[in-house]
Amino acid sequence: MLRNSEISWERYCELRDGDPYLARWGFTMYRTYYGLGSDENWKALLEKAKEETFKELDECDHDDLAAKLKPIFQIDARSDQSLLNDLSLGVLCQVYNDKVGGDPMPRLESPVFLVADEHSLDQISEGNWIVKSVDADYPPREEIPIRTSTEENWWGWGRMELRQIPWLWKKLAGEDSRYCFRWTVHQADLDNVIWFHSSSMEEAV
């Protein structure tokens, strides 16, 4: 992942030097499900996010960049049943933009946050580590009426594996989320697809 990663590192340094708050990288993640067993799964999800991110950094390290990125990686975990329980992605965009609960993680080209909903947390027992990524500038809209066009559309969100966190961050360092989230004919199709990223960062830059 980190081969030829100067673009991301230089972009990070620009952001960091412009504002002390930006001396870290990662994403804000909202938990919207609080049912039976979800506390344990939420904790496991956060631990796995760090584990998978570090694993990706190590496997694709170049010029010891992983050693620079690991100490400043953070998942800004937001878990508040009274505030976040069962919120829609659209409402979460408002929560993010209004900085409810404090400033979210620094944005890159697009203000993207992650979501662990009921499906995400329930799937952990099956070994599936999948969350939703959402662009806060484009609150998801309901597909009413159902589109008749067969052309693929961009919906402002998508599904991704935890191991893709550093890949998403790198992509967002130089491109907006329209190049990071899947395009589908219908919004419901997103429930059945995962974001695809190139295995070569020379292509992904």
Predicted regions and their residues:
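Extended, charge-biased low-complexity segments
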Residues: 1-155
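Acidic, proline/glycine-rich low-complexity IDRs
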Residues: 139-205
